[in-house]
């Protein structure tokens, strides 16, 4: 029987994702905190936090799950041509805090953000410990787009992206895919499907299949140099 779990501030194991509610889709647990060990345990088990500033902490594992396969992200011919013309520079882990702040800005027709100060502090700590990473897109010295997420073995768990110029977030996605392919990653978790992700080639897979893939990949080693601060040259041929 599916039922909602309530977490206290003592560290405890998450319930199985299979126990998540159908309505709302994927809600698994309420409460707890955003300590690094709890966040890492969540992602390690296919669970992520998502809540508004006036909500308690909510933990989710939706079914279906939106994913990308590195190498199958759709970069259209017109987008390739557009990106080739731009004098943009793309980097890894140069400005994690600024990327999170950009992602936290309310979108058009939205009054608030789920990327609260509490969330930003928690993920900055994960960045400092080498678990959370960012891709930045620059025009000169101005940050015009980017994304951030967590690396769990050979899985990259995407959290959010933003742009201040047209297609800058898509440039970040293209750079992420290129980098992950080179570093041997097998899966990008995009969490919940939406039209934008679908246009980029995201697929919805059953939660049980996602968890199976995650268990196969989460302990696989990756090159320690994968997330050193560096510049990425987009290969768009």
Swiss-Prot record:
GO CC aspect terms: cytoplasm
Key words of the record: Acyltransferase, Cytoplasm, Transferase
EC numbers, comma separated: 2.3.2.6
InterPro entries, sorted: Acyl_CoA_acyltransferase, Leu/Phe-tRNA_Trfase, Leu/Phe-tRNA_Trfase_C, Leu/Phe-tRNA_Trfase_N
Pfam family, one: Leu_Phe_trans
Subcellular location: Cytoplasm
Main location: cytoplasm
Swiss-Prot/TrEMBL catalytic activity: N-terminal L-lysyl-[protein] + L-leucyl-tRNA(Leu) = N-terminal L-leucyl-L-lysyl-[protein] + tRNA(Leu) + H(+); N-terminal L-arginyl-[protein] + L-leucyl-tRNA(Leu) = N-terminal L-leucyl-L-arginyl-[protein] + tRNA(Leu) + H(+); L-phenylalanyl-tRNA(Phe) + an N-terminal L-alpha-aminoacyl-[protein] = an N-terminal L-phenylalanyl-L-alpha-aminoacyl-[protein] + tRNA(Phe)
Tagged with keyword Mitochondrion: no
Gene Ontology terms describing biological process: protein catabolic process
GO molecular function: leucyl-tRNA--protein transferase activity
Function (record text): Functions in the N-end rule pathway of protein degradation where it conjugates Leu, Phe and, less efficiently, Met from aminoacyl-tRNAs to the N-termini of proteins containing an N-terminal arginine or lysine.
Family listed: Belongs to the L/F-transferase family.
Database matches in HAMAP family: Leu_Phe_trans
Full protein name: Leucyl/phenylalanyl-tRNA--protein transferase
Source species of the chain: Shewanella baltica (strain OS185)
Gene: aat
């Amino acid at each position: 029987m599916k039922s909602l779990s309530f977490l206290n501030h003592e560290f405890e194991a998450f319930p199985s994702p299979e126990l998540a509610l159908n309505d709302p889709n994927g809600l698994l647990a309420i409460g707890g905190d955003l300590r690094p060990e709890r966040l890492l345990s969540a992602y390690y088990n296919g669970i992520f936090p998502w809540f508004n500033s006036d909500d308690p902490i909510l933990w989710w594992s939706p079914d279906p799950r939106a994913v990308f396969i590195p190498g199958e992200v759709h970069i259209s011919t017109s987008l390739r041509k557009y990106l080739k013309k731009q004098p943009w520079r793309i980097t890894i882990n140069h400005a994690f805090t600024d990327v999170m702040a950009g992602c936290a800005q309310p979108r058009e027709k939205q009054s608030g953000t789920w990327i609260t100060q509490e969330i930003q502090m928690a993920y900055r700590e994960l960045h400092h410990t080498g678990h959370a990473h960012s891709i930045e897109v620059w025009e000169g010295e101005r940050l015009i787009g980017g994304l951030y997420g967590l690396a769990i073995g050979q899985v990259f768990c995407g959290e959010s992206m933003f742009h201040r110029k047209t297609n800058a977030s898509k440039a970040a996605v293209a750079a992420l895919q290129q980098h992950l392919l080179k570093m041997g990653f097998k899966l990008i978790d995009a969490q919940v499907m939406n039209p934008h992700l679908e246009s980029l080639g995201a697929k919805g897979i059953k939660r049980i299949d996602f968890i199976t893939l995650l268990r196969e990949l989460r302990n696989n080693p990756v090159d320690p140099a994968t997330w050193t601060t560096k510049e990425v040259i987009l290969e768009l041929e």
